[in-house]
């Protein structure tokens, strides 16, 4: 599945966090306008033709948006991630 990176930030000690809106195919509706991600820690994503392992997932309220933590200092310059396509 492909989607667009909405935002990106680096958090010291946690890694690079990319904010994406997950497609419906990667979500499970659990009720009360709340969704659970089918994407799991350890899954791989591809950004700019480079693969990264998901090291953590941050849920953002009850929306379809999640923050994927994809690594530490080994991640490319995050400025290259804004608005880019991510393959999950």
Residue ranges and their predicted role:
Residues 2-15, 19-88:
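Beta-strand/loop-dominated core regions that host nucleotide or nucleotide-derived cofactor-binding catalytic loops
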